Amino acid sequence: MADSDTSAPAKAKPAALRKGALVKVNRKAYSASIEAAASDPTPPDYIFDGPGELLVVKGDYGQVRWNRPVPDVWLRMDQLEVYS
């Protein structure tokens, strides 16, 4: 018998988010973050429902503008996901 490779297939990397992308916040990633600990204990639902527009990407952070009369926010890029 031939040896078979039983290792799991490599996960595909998600597409990199770029300026202008429509995004929403990943609830699980945000809830476990230091940003959530430093913010209101009940975050607004619109950040998880989306869409928000990614305005600027600097290093590990992105500035998001929501389609509401609220200030833009900076969040870690690993807390953001593509809005679909």
Swiss-Prot record:
Its main location: membrane. Keywords: Membrane, NAD, NADP, Plastoquinone, Quinone, Thylakoid, Translocase, Transport. It is a peripheral membrane protein. Disulfide bonds: none annotated. The keyword NADP applies. InterPro entries: NdhO. It is found in: Cellular thylakoid membrane. It catalyses: a plastoquinone + NADH + (n+1) H(+)(in) = a plastoquinol + NAD(+) + n H(+)(out); a plastoquinone + NADPH + (n+1) H(+)(in) = a plastoquinol + NADP(+) + n H(+)(out). GO terms for molecular function: oxidoreductase activity, acting on NAD(P)H, quinone or similar compound as acceptor; quinone binding. One of its GO terms (cellular component) is plasma membrane-derived thylakoid membrane. Its EC number is 7.1.1.-. It comes from the Bacteria. NDH-1 shuttles electrons from an unknown electron donor, via FMN and iron-sulfur (Fe-S) centers, to quinones in the respiratory and/or the photosynthetic chain. The immediate electron acceptor for the enzyme in this species is believed to be plastoquinone. Couples the redox reaction to proton translocation, and thus conserves the redox energy in a proton gradient. Cyanobacterial NDH-1 also plays a role in inorganic carbon-concentration. NDH-1 can be composed of about 15 different subunits; different subcomplexes with different compositions have been identified which probably have different functions. Belongs to the complex I NdhO subunit family. This is NAD(P)H-quinone oxidoreductase subunit O. It comes from Synechococcus sp. (strain CC9902).
